């Protein structure tokens, strides 16, 4: 759930965050946001290398490390609007790349372990279901939080979700 909330929820709200905090046009913020998926492709590669080489196929350690790493750019994003837009985009791209790595781990690498039991698809389906429940909650929820409390509170909420992901 947390991974889906962070992956899809943050990505969905990035253009609005940039538009509102930097007073740029929606089309410009969408253009900046369009760069991120290209950069995020490296997340799957990085996630696989961490999982196989650094954490030696330990899913829990890889996941905890990845979620801990999301806290670095998220902490910087708390101060969005107080530094140049380029830094914001770099921090957001770093965050979305890390969360893409976690998505690859949870959706692809972990379910493969269940193939020997004939359950890879079942596990993958359960993980996908949880991801999209999180996505649905965050798409509405992050907007509600930002409307009521502002973007700083929303990013602090993202940090709390990152901490939950570490646990």
Language-model regions: role of each:
Residues 44-57, 146:
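Helix-to-loop junctions at the C-terminal end of transmembrane segments
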Residues 114-149:
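A late C-terminal transmembrane helix in Major Facilitator Superfamily
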Residues 57-109:
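C-terminal transmembrane helical hairpin of 12-TM major facilitator-type secondary transporters
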Residues 17-22, 53-54, 109-117, 148:
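Helix-to-coil boundary motifs at intracellular loop junctions of multi-pass secondary transporters
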Residues 1-48, 103, 107-108, 138-139:
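Extracytoplasmic gate region of multi-pass secondary transporters
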Residues 2, 35, 39, 69, ...:
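Small/hydrophobic positions within alpha-helical transmembrane segments
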Residues 58, 141-162:
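A membrane-interface helix-boundary motif in multi-pass transporters
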Residues 25-33, 88, 120, 124:
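Juxtamembrane helix-start elements in MFS-like secondary transporters
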């Amino acid at each position: 759930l947390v991974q889906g909330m962070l992956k899809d929820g943050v990505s969905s709200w990035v253009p609005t965050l940039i538009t509102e905090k930097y007073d740029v046009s929606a089309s410009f913020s969408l253009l900046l946001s369009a760069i991120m998926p290209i950069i995020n492709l490296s997340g799957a590669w990085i996630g696989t290398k961490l999982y196989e080489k650094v954490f030696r196929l330990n899913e829990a350690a890889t996941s905890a490390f990845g979620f801990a790493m999301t806290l670095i750019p998220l902490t910087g994003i708390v101060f969005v609007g107080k530094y140049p837009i380029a830094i914001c985009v770099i921090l957001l791209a770093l965050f979305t790349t890390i969360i893409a790595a976690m998505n690859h781990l949870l959706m692809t690498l972990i379910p493969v372990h269940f193939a020997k039991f004939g359950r890879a698809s079942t596990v993958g389906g359960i993980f996908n279901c949880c991801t999209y429940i999180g996505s649905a909650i965050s798409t509405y929820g992050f907007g509600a939080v930002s409307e009521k409390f502002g973007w700083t509170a929303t990013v602090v909420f993202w940090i709390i979700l990152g901490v939950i992901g570490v646990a």
